[in-house]
């Protein structure tokens, strides 16, 4: 499957493409579904800004189960500030509607004005997080900031890297 996460005012749109034939890349799209405050989704207060979705292998600390965790970064807001990361266990069989609702978090990476972000998982299993940040929205310019984050930090101890 392929997951698309796109920006929209107040949150995200999620859509899932499911392959019916990998060899020919045939398949079908689900429907784009809004993720925001009304479905306990990814809330972006007073903004529509690019972010990143990343799937990582993790261990649920309470159950000990191996899981796949979806991470979604966006400015939490209001406006373009307080970039953060939402998280959610996924199985790979979710519909767009399932994927859009019931996210946990967010973990706030910064309280400062901040906007676009991207992330990858490093070989040591930490999350490399790269984002725009500035001291004031009136400056019309961002600095690029790099941080390494642990999965346990992002999830408030609920998950750890596997």
Residue map of PLM features:
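Hydrophobic core register within WD40 beta-propeller blades
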Residues: 53, 117-119
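Beta-rich carbohydrate-recognition and catalytic domains
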Residues: 1-49, 55-112, 123-126, 131-162
């Amino acid at each position: 499957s392929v997951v698309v996460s796109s920006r929209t005012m107040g949150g995200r749109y999620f859509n899932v493409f499911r392959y019916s034939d990998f060899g020919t890349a045939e398949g079908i799209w689900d429907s784009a579904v809004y993720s925001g405050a009304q479905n306990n989704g990814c809330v972006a207060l007073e903004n529509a800004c690019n972010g990143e979705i990343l799937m990582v292998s993790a261990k649920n600390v309470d159950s000990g189960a191996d899981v796949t965790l979806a991470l979604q970064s966006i400015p939490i807001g209001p406006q373009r500030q307080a970039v953060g990361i939402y998280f959610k266990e996924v199985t790979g069989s979710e519909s767009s509607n399932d994927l859009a609702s019931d996210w946990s978090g967010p973990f706030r990476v910064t309280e400062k004005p901040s906007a676009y972000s991207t992330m990858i998982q490093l070989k040591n299993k930490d999350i490399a997080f790269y984002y725009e940040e500035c001291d004031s929205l009136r400056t019309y310019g961002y600095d690029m900031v790099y941080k390494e984050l642990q999965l346990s930090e992002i999830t408030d101890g609920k998950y750890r890297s596997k």
